[in-house]
Amino acid sequence: HTKIMFLCHNVFPHERFPMDRFLTKKVLEKGDYFIVQSKMDESDLYQIKSDPGVKLTPHPTYNAFRLQNLSRSESRELIRASKDEKILLFFGFVREYKGLKHLLRAMPEIIKQVENVRLFVVGDFGEDRDQYMELIREKKIEDAVEVVEGYIPDKEVEKYFAACDLVVLPYESATQSGIVQIAYGFRKPVLVTIVGGLPDVVTDGKTGYVVES
């Protein structure tokens, strides 16, 4: 019979919906070969098939977004940030499991310890925008948080990564994330939590920082 190969970004979805695991198992049981991108996905796959033909291949570094080769100063001019600011970047679709609320709650302490720091939150909020805006007001960090809401087209990605000093992924759960590989493409360090496959692709103290979730 025809051999079927699955490339699994996630074996199981981050956000649950009725019958998701049942349907996932029914589909993946038909596979002959699998490519997964984290050890967590590999482990999840073994819950479905006892002997899958599986290859673990982490995300490659993404260089495709370096369209203009913007310098740090050029990119900061585009996002209206000064050369002296310490820029933190949270990038991508904002979802509950990505832990943005933890980063916002930590910002008052970060502001105390890091002079001239600003957090850029860049991405689509979906239906959850109001709770994050309220948290920003509650913590009185409006001046230190820049929200750029909406889908970011490929040509706009570069200016945010080229301008930042650190990319932050305070996730509560994850198998892996392409955001890390985008950051690496711009030679930017990342801060990730010890969840899923994120620690697999970050060398603590060298390519970034790995912290408790």
Regions found by a protein language model. Name each.
Residues 29-70:
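Donor nucleotide-sugar binding/catalytic pocket of nucleotide-sugar-dependent glycosyltransferases
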Residues 66-81:
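A short helix/loop element that forms part of the nucleotide-sugar donor recognition site in Leloir-type
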Residues 82-98, 104-107, 120:
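Conserved donor-binding/catalytic core segment of Leloir-type glycosyltransferases
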Residues 91, 118-133, 150:
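Glycosyltransferase donor-sugar binding loop
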Residues 132-151, 155:
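Nucleotide-activated donor-binding/catalytic signature segment of Leloir-type glycosyltransferases, i.e.
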Residues 159-177, 188:
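Acidic donor-binding loop of glycosyltransferase active sites
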Residues 189-192, 202:
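Short hydrophobic beta-strand element within catalytic cores of glycosyltransferases
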Residues 204-205, 209-213:
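Conserved acidic donor-binding segment of nucleotide-sugar-dependent glycosyltransferases
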